[in-house]
UniProtKB/Swiss-Prot annotation:
Keywords: GTPase activation, Metal-binding, Phosphoprotein, Zinc, Zinc-finger. Residues 118-195, 214-248, 333-459 are annotated as: Disordered. It holds the Pfam family ArfGap. Residues 180-193, 420-431 have a biased composition (Basic and acidic residues). Residues 4-120 form the Arf-GAP domain. The keyword Metal-binding applies. The modification Phosphoserine is found at residues 169, 188. One of its GO terms (molecular function) is GTPase activator activity. This is Probable ADP-ribosylation factor GTPase-activating protein AGD6. It comes from Arabidopsis thaliana. Residues 335-344, 360-380 have a biased composition (Polar residues). The keyword DNA repair does not apply. GO terms for biological process: vesicle-mediated transport.
């Protein structure tokens, strides 16, 4: 913005409100090499001269550096025209001849030195001869001439060299064909420069571009050329593109992902810690202010005492329950084993009684029986017939108390059979039955039966 304001200030000066090479007003282009302002048409001609002769910039559309602003301040349209007038060059002189003159070269050096702050002394003035370009040959009546530069001699090299020059426009060709002897400003000729001058200009161009390339190498690459950066683009070799290594890309992406994840985790942990610390401080301050810390400690002590007391009571209750459970398990185990033994003995006694009845019937049919045996048998049958579902519990108890002899001898084993004769009068049937069984066994031993009874059955 500061550069634009300075340019506007310079442009608002009276001598800079008109183009330096023509009468066009309000010029919007400038030549940094001379510090002058020009119109659009003349700026195109200046661009054709080359940047080493005239470096053209737009006042509004281009960016300007500090050194360029200083060159514009050191120059000016009126100063340039006065300087050229000392060398005999008028304002209406052709742009090509004007700015390729020795006076233009001296003025460029003068502007460069003043912008850089170096002292400058103008050299002695040597007026230059104003050489007019040769007039065009031929017209409508002389179109067949080989030297007229018309379309009939388009393949003639000599005519082409004499008429076709750089910066020669279509208007120049029309002027040369329409008006014989007319003066064309923008048309150059071989008579303007000698061979030695052209060779010197070529050598100067090579040195100029070499110097420009050396200066460009020393400039930074991060800035645009308008701000003093390095020229990189058309006409120069750019840096080779870096090789794309997929493995490096993957590792870089993974490392960046882990790095970002670690940063997020660290920030989250820091935020959580700060929040917890703030909440803890607030809670502690409120507790201390309200006197809740003493109440909380008392409550904790009471809860601890109650918990200990309840624990002791619970442990005592659990010990009592475990002792009761152990006692009950032992009682149930003993009762189960006793009932199993009694059931086995009842089954054995029942089988013995039935088998005894069968043997009694057989003995009575073979050798005759005693009246007591028959009465006992009848009594047993009566007792069996009287066995019903109404008295099944009483009969079961009676069977449990009944005992059978273990051997054929008259002596009985008292182990486990004590109190077997302590029965009521209603159990006489079982006593008779036992006596019958003893008589049968003795008869068997005396007679034909050799069966012996053991605790497990017959042998």
């Amino acid at each position: 913005m500061a550069a634009t304001r300075q340019l506007r200030t310079l442009q608002s000066q009276p001598e800079n409100k008109v183009c330096v090479d023509c009468a066009q007003k309000n010029p919007q282009w400038a030549s940094v090499s001379y510090g002058i302002f020009m119109c659009l048409e003349c700026s195109g001609k200046h661009r054709g001269l080359g940047v080493h002769i005239s470096f053209v910039r737009s006042v509004t559309m281009d960016s300007w550096s500090a050194i360029q602003i200083k060159k514009m301040e050191a120059g000016g349209n009126e100063r340039l025209n006065k300087f050229f007038a000392q060398y005999g060059i008028a304002k209406e002189t052709d742009i090509i001849s004007k700015y390729n003159s020795n006076a233009a070269s001296v003025y460029r050096d003068r502007i460069q030195a003043l912008a850089e702050g170096r002292p400058w002394n103008d050299p002695p003035v040597v007026k230059e001869a104003n050489k007019k370009p040769p007039l065009a040959q031929g017209g409508y009546g002389n179109n067949n001439n080989n030297n007229n530069g018309g379309w009939d001699s388009w393949d003639n090299d000599d005519s082409y060299k004499s008429d076709m020059r750089r910066n020669q426009s279509a208007n120049d060709f029309r002027a040369s064909g329409n008006r014989e002897g007319a003066h064309v400003k923008s048309k150059s000729s071989e008579d303007i420069y000698t061979r030695s001058q052209l060779e010197a200009s070529a050598a100067g161009k090579e040195s100029f571009f070499a110097r420009r390339m050396a200066e460009n190498e020393s400039k930074p690459e991060g800035l645009p050329p308008s701000q003093g950066g390095k020229y990189v683009g058309f006409g120069s070799s750019s840096a080779p593109p870096p090789r794309n290594n997929q493995q490096d890309d993957v590792f870089s992406v993974v490392s960046q992902g882990f790095g970002r994840l670690s940063l997020v985790a660290a920030s989250a942990a820091q935020s959580a810690a700060s929040v917890v610390q703030t909440g803890t401080k607030e809670f502690t301050s409120k507790v201390k202010e309200g006197g809740y810390d003493h109440k909380v400690s008392e409550t904790v002590n009471v809860v601890a005492n109650k918990t200990t007391e309840i624990g002791h009571r619970t442990w005592g209750i659990m010990k009592g329950v475990m002792a009761m459970a152990t006692q009950k398990v032992e009682e149930f185990t003993k009762e189960g084993s006793t009932s199993w033994n009694q059931q086995s003995e009842n089954e054995g006694n029942g089988y013995y009684q039935n088998f005894g009845n069968g043997n009694k019937a057989a003995n009575s049919s073979v050798g005759g029986g005693r009246p007591q045996s028959s009465s006992t048998s009848g009594h047993y049958n009566n007792s069996q017939n009287s066995n019903s579902w109404d008295s099944w519990g009483e009969n079961e108890n009676k069977k449990t108390e009944a005992v059978a002899p273990k051997g054929s001898s008259a002596s009985n084993d008292d182990d486990g059979w004590t109190g077997w004769d302590d029965h009521d009068a209603k159990d006489d049937g079982f006593d008779g039955h036992y006596q019958s069984a003893g008589d049968k066994k003795s008869a068997g031993h005396n007679g034909k039966s050799d069966t012996a009874w053991t605790g497990g059955g017959f042998l």
